[in-house]
């Protein structure tokens, strides 16, 4: 058999087992662990290429062949780094393996026929669409920003640029939940809305769950007292929905121990652990030692840089409706911003003690930068802490699997939607992001939503080819009209589905049910389930995990930044 040299092979079909690929301009390298394609039987589309009738394309009908195949993709997910073809049917992933024509090719598991469309992924990286579970729905324009960064699912609350939504991720009450569910039908992205959980009596919380809320949010700005926490969790346990909490920064109704006692070992998603977004000052970070708490942090403090602290005071004043002329408001804001705990946040993510990363969109966070800042943090930690156990030169797979899980599978597990989204696995919605390695984590090439491209880098529509400038992200056919509703999903509670919310509101989108939220523990957080014994010095704010002082320096330069955003 004539063999291609590695350079020519990689240029034609992409890298294979044992090859390493650099991620953007970081110091992170991914190494391919397995190749499902077969040497000499690879399929590729184009003039003079393999996917032609009677060659790599068979004559099967629609029932036998896939609707869409991504060829020779490098798949990066929490479960591994492989090279494979990806088959999609009816908007869902149906195959990860070897595509082609089974009549003449060996080992074919994904059938290509006359009804099959192709996305050439040779040399490209495919990841699951990101999941942001800390979204303030302040304006609908966020959706395009999120999509063009690689996000395909948003969970949070809000009703637009109201004072309440600027500060909290709550869509309060039956009327607003109904209107936001109807609005979501027009948005080409998966969405779930969290209702307001700050109530010491259950009736209004139950109403919101019946109205279609995917879960509830307890926030200090509405009240995060022991009574509201206990009531909200009681309701959540009865209806199998998740509770997210932003705890009491001022310690007015109790300290961290008071909140932990009110939680009573029940499952809860804790926001802002740590960062500078709020929560019991100064030791909310200790909550990541508990098995019943699923901890996340937000992107404005990631990674810790020389500018992180300075930018936060003004952000805090605006988002939480504070007055810069009132000393008590200044003191409130400053109590949240601590260099020591912000630095510890980076390290705890690298240890796998913090399980998720989200945005806090337009409310002290940036909806288009969650993926970007996740990989900047991973890069910073590799430089400052070295390779993780199991990694070596040109192989950071352990660290990469840890960090990608923070914005894909773990948020999905936390909010009971992992049966639908969160990973590149058979049976799940085909929410996939295609990246050129040099732009990985920064600017995706195209975003597939429910099996159809919804957003892509695109050149001048009047040009003779797709690539001439100006080149920027544009919404594609999958984001329009009924196609959008057939490829996006609205997530609601089981009880709201049972009482007929979908029919009553005339929702047209795919419907996903949040389920199995209440028995999840931190042990279920994939690649991110460390539960260290935490200590925080109340005077110096020094943070220790299992007795080790968590200290890292702020960086003055980060990758994936200016060289990618000159234009």
Curated annotation (Swiss-Prot):
It is an enzyme of class 3 (hydrolase). GO terms for molecular function: nickel cation binding; urease activity. Ni(2+) 2 binds at residues 217, 246, 272. The active site is at 320 (proton donor). Its main location: cytoplasm. Pfam families: Amidohydro_1, Urease_alpha. Heterotrimer of UreA (gamma), UreB (beta) and UreC (alpha) subunits. Three heterotrimers associate to form the active enzyme. This is Urease subunit alpha. It comes from Blochmanniella floridana.
């Amino acid at each position: 058999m004539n063999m291609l040299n590695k350079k020519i092979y990689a240029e034609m079909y992409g890298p294979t087992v044992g090859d390493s690929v650099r991620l953007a301009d970081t110091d992170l390298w991914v190494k391919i662990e397995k190749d499902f394609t077969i040497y000499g039987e690879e399929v590729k589309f184009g003039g003079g290429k393999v996917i032609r009738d009677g060659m790599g394309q068979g004559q099967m009908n629609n029932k036998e062949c896939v609707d869409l195949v991504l060829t020779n993709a490098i798949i990066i997910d929490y479960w591994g780094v492989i090279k494979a073809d990806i088959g999609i049917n009816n908007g869902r992933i149906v195959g990860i393996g070897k595509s082609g024509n089974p009549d003449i090719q060996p080992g074919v598991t994904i059938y290509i026929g006359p009804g099959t469309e192709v996305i050439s992924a040779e040399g490209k990286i495919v990841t699951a669409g990101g999941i942001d579970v800390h979204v303030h729905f302040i304006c609908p324009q966020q959706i395009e920003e999120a999509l063009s960064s690689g996000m395909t699912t948003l969970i949070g609350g809000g009703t637009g640029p109201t004072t309440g939504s600027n500060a909290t991720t709550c869509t309060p009450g039956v009327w607003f939940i109904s209107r936001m569910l109807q609005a979501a039908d027009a948005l080409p992205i998966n969405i779930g809305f969290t209702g307001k959980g700050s109530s010491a009596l259950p009736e209004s919380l139950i109403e919101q769950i019946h109205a279609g809320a995917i879960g509830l949010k307890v926030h200090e700005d509405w009240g995060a007292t022991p009574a509201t926490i206990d009531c909200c969790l009681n309701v959540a346990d009865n209806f199998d929905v998740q509770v997210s909490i932003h705890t009491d920064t001022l310690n007015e109704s109790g300290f961290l121990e008071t909140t932990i006692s009110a939680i009573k070992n029940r499952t809860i998603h804790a926001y802002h652990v740590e960062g500078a977004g709020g929560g019991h000052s100064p030791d909310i970070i200790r909550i990541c030692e508990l098995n019943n708490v699923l901890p996340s942090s937000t992107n404005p403090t990631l990674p810790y840089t020389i500018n992180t602290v300075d930018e936060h005071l003004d952000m805090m004043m605006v988002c939480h409706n504070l007055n810069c002329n009132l000393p008590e408001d200044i003191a409130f804001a400053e109590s949240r911003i601590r260099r020591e705990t912000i630095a510890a946040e980076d390290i705890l993510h690298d240890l796998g003690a913090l399980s998720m990363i989200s945005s806090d969109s337009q409310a002290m966070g940036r909806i288009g930068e969650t993926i970007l800042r996740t990989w900047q943090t991973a890069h910073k930690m590799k430089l400052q802490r070295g390779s993780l156990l199991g990694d070596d030169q040109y192989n950071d797979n352990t660290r990469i699997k840890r960090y990608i899980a923070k914005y894909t599978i773990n948020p999905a597990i936390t909010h009971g939607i992992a049966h639908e989204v969160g990973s590149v696995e058979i049976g799940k919605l085909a929410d996939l992001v295609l990246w050129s390695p040099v732009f990985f984590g920064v600017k995706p090439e195209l975003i597939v939503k429910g099996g159809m491209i919804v957003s892509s880098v695109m050149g001048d529509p009047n040009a003779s080819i797709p690539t001439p400038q100006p080149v920027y992200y544009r919404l594609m056919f999958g984001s329009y009209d009924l196609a959008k509703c057939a490829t996006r999903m609205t997530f609601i509670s089981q009880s709201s589905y049972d009482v007929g919310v979908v029919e009553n509101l005339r929702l047209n989108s795919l419907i996903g049910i949040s389920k199995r939220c209440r028995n999840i523990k931190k042990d279920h957080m994939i690649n991110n389930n460390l539960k260290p014994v935490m200590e925080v010095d109340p005077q110096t704010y020094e943070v220790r995990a299992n007795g080790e002082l968590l200290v890292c320096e702020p960086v003055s330069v980060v990758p994936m930044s200016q060289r990618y955003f000159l234009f």
